[in-house]
Every structure is written in C-alpha cells, then in structure tokens.
Regions:
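Non-catalytic DNA-recognition/assembly elements of restriction-modification systems
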Residues: 2-4, 8-11, 15-55, 178, ...
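Hydrophobic pocket-lining residues within nucleotide cofactor-binding pockets
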Residues: 77, 176, 300, 401, ...
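Amphipathic alpha-helical hairpins/coiled-coils and adjacent low-complexity
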Residues: 233-237
Length: 468
C-alpha cells in the first residue's frame, strides 16, 4: 500500500474481492484493464486514499449524543448530495467517540453512502464522524479529494451493481477495498475539478440567493401581517420603515380588539378560504394534455423544486391530476411536517401536481403571495403536522390547509404586498430554472471529463458562457 497517511485505517476485516465489476465511467470493482486516454491509469483507490468507515454511538446512552462533533447520517447525505457540509442533523461528542467504533475524520474526507440509500456523496467541510452506513476516504497527495467526489458522483447507477442484498442493498467492504479509479496526473485532476466546480459554485450561489429572497419575502409578510409593524409605527406617531408615503397611507394608524387580540382597525379575522379556492383545476380523460410535467410530493421541499417528471397522460401516475397555474400554492397533505410545499411563479404546458397536495388558487392574482406565505409559515406547517393522523401515512384534509387562519387586510394592502413580494418569488423561480440548467450541463460534462473522453479546451468556453 503506497499511501500511508497519518493514522491507521479501521474497516471490516475481509480482504478485497478478486472479482471485477466494471463501473460506467471511471470506477470499477477490481482492475478492468480497459483502455484509457494517454496519461491515465487504473489505480487501486486504497493505494492513494485511506479507507475508513464509521459507527453509531449507543442510543442507550444519551450522554453520548449532543456536543461538538458533527455526525453524518443518511439524511445528511441525501439532503446534500455532491456538496461539502459543515453541519449535520445530529451531533455526538468525545465520550460517544471514545465508547464506540466511530472516529473523527479530517476535513476534505470524501463519504459515500453504502447501504439503505446507496450512492450519495458528501465531503466533510470540517472534522466529523459518520455512521456505519458510509465508507470514507482520506485522500493522499496523488488524488484530489474533489476529483474523487466527482468520480463517485458519476458512478451513481453503477453502485447498484456493486451492491448486494434483497431487503436493503449494501456495498460490502470486499468490493469497496477493490475499488479502482481511472486517474490522470494530479494537475489534470485539478483542472477538471476547477471546470466542474465553476458550475457547482454558480449553482450554490443561486441556491443561496434564493434562500435570501425567500427569507426577505417571509420577513416582509411577518412584518406587515403578523407583527403589524407599519400600523404599530403609525399608532406611535412614527413613519413606517422601508416604505414610501403612498404605501404607508394604506395602513390604519390604530388597533381594535378581536377574538385574536389587537388587530389593525378595519382588518378582520378570516381564513385563506376568503382568498383562495381549493383544488379547483384537475385533469380529466376528456380534458387532459397529451403529456404532463408532474410534480409529486418528493419533487418539492420548502419551495425548492426538482425537475418535473414527464409522462404521457395515459402513462402518468394516477395521482397526476392537479392542473397547476401561475400563483398556485402547493402544500402536501401527507406528512406535512416534511415541508413539501411550493409556489408556482412560472408554468409550462401540462404542469401537473399530485392529488397529495392541497392546491390553493388565488381568487385574484394579487392575493397569491399572501396565500403562499401565510400557508407555509413555520407555525402553520407545525399546526398541520400536529393535526395529521393515520398510521403509515399521517395526513390532513385539504380543507385544513385552506382553513388556515389569517388577519385579512384591505385589498389595496394586498395589492401593494403583491407588488413587493411577487417579484421576489418570481426571481426564485427564474434562479431555480437557471440552476437546473447548469446542473444538466454539469451532469452532461461530468462523465466525459472524469473519464478523459472530453478534453478541457473543448468545454471551457461553454462553461464560461453558462455561468456568465
């Protein structure tokens, strides 16, 4: 073993398999001895990176949990595939590490989920530990950890061939120890990484921008319609902040008593049923598009949409029936605590939602941002989650989503709020589409670059144009 990094590897004891299972791009169980471009070589991964696994400290000892050591579980990987992570859902501590087979691994360790949900890849952004559901590599000087990350990402489909098991697919250690990677010189690895990272960095920036835009819209909704800041300011003789005189004039300058406590004078206690219709547009056999672009419950989380699944209407899932239009709010009625909700700021022919969503369609276009931001407030999602019943599939009735309570302002206030909030939500949609386009380009270039079939000069101009 040529690579001798600091520390001794701890992995399961069985030796590497002597069989060969070729991957799709640049990874294989065993040496496939297939031809490679000049300057590229099939190398056993453990010659250049220390193989590690992880462990779960005992749940019977609560003192092992909570602390300063991030602990990567499957949910961290599925939520952050391909990314460098700094935070995890669960944390352990040095007591948990000392009393288990878990160990703290250094920043830039590359982690691959090997069981349950096979094939998810993350990189440690700081020293962390993982569960036993991962195999981890601490890379030496001859392999760039980011290059290894991209190799593993490119082989997502191949991992199912490397795995075995009926109930749960698992990649076992004899196969992992036999991993061979097609490697060029490290300076070539870094140039490839720089090209792919330029796309990923732009995608991450768009996601961060969208999170900021969404936060601004939520904060504005809370200020106007929950905390009543403009009304409070006027009642105290101050000018409302962050708005011009014409907008400020739309708000009353005093409060009145209601069943909800003090609310702005002239506003009223109501529900979203006053502003939005429920599940009003559905496809039927007589009125249906030839093809549908389908969004299911797994296809959106906290207004981040996956690309729609495309079917002919005849072949689409039976739940693919809700016609979606600009301004619609989607809120999952099944397991609402999973936060499968979103706002339709742009549409396309045949855009279709699952019948597992409550679809709130605004009665006026200017009501749309208010409906979305009210229905998807953390407090309301928590309310729906608490009301969900049923064993395997806890759910709420769609009417409970439409019945979300609100304090209803005068319509000119809703019009003004729309003028501020809708451009933010529309920009989120535009940015998300741009990010999806960049991801498609990355996924097209990835296998060709990582295998040496595409030379860098052939794609660098295309990448620069895409991220400009």
């Amino acid at each position: 073993m040529r690579f001798d990094p600091r520390g001794e590897a701890r992995t399961a004891g069985r030796a590497a398999t002597t069989g060969v299972i070729p991957g799709d791009v640049a990874l294989s169980v065993g040496n496939p001895r297939s031809p490679l471009p000049e300057g590229w070589t099939w190398c056993q991964l453990t010659d250049f990176a220390r193989l590690e696994t992880g462990h779960t400290p005992s749940r019977k000892h609560p003192e092992y949990w909570g602390g300063e050591v991030p602990w990567i579980g499957i949910r961290d990987a599925t939520a952050n595939h391909g990314r460098t992570i700094l935070k995890t859902e669960q944390y352990t501590n040095h007591l948990g590490i000392e009393n288990s087979s878990a160990r703290i691994l250094p920043a830039n360790t590359v982690c691959l989920s090997r069981t349950a949900s096979v094939g998810y890849v993350v990189v440690m952004g700081r020293p962390m530990a993982t569960s036993q559901d991962f195999v981890n590599w601490v890379c030496g000087a001859e392999i760039d950890y980011r290059f290894l990350k991209y190799v593993l990402m490119a082989e997502r489909d191949a991992f199912l061939r490397f795995a075995s098991g009926t109930t749960h697919q698992t990649i076992y250690f004899p196969e992992v120890k036999a991993f061979h990677v097609a490697l060029p010189a490290v300076h070539v690895q870094r140039r490839i990484v720089e090209t792919l990272s330029a796309l990923d960095d732009r995608i991450d920036l768009l996601r961060q921008t969208n999170a900021t835009l969404e936060s601004i819209a939520q904060a504005l909704f809370k200020s106007w319609f929950i905390d009543f800041d403009p009304v409070r300011a006027k009642a105290e003789g101050r000018e409302p902040e962050g708005m011009d005189a014409a907008t400020a004039a739309l708000f009353p300058g005093e409060f009145e008593q209601s069943a909800l406590g003090l609310i702005p004078k002239g506003w009223r206690r109501s529900s979203l049923a006053a502003l939005a219709d429920l599940n009003v547009a559905s496809w039927s056999a007589r009125r249906a598009p030839t093809e549908v672009a389908y969004i299911d419950l797994a296809g959106v989380k906290a207004n981040v949409f996956e690309p729609p699944q495309r079917y002919t209407f005849a072949a689409a899932p039976s739940r693919a029936r809700r016609e979606l239009r600009v301004g619609d709010t989607l809120v999952a009625t099944v397991r609402p605590g999973n936060r499968s909700f979103g706002f339709i700021a742009e549409t396309e022919p045949g855009l279709t939602g699952s019948t597992g969503f409550a679809v709130l369609s605004p009665k006026s276009a200017s009501f749309a941002p208010f409906v979305y931001l009210c229905a998807t407030r953390d407090e309301n999602i928590d309310r729906l989650s608490a009301l969900a019943d049923g064993g395997a599939y806890p759910a709420v009735r769609p009417e409970l989503v439409q019945g979300t309570e609100c304090v209803l302002p005068a319509e000119p206030v809703l019009d003004s709020f729309h003028s501020f909030a809708f451009p933010l939500l529309h920009c989120v949609s535009v940015n998300a589409q741009h990010a999806r386009s960049l991801a498609e380009l990355r996924d097209t270039l990835l296998p060709r670059l990582i295998s040496g079939k595409l030379r860098l000069p052939e794609c660098q101009e295309q990448v620069q144009e895409a991220i400009a």
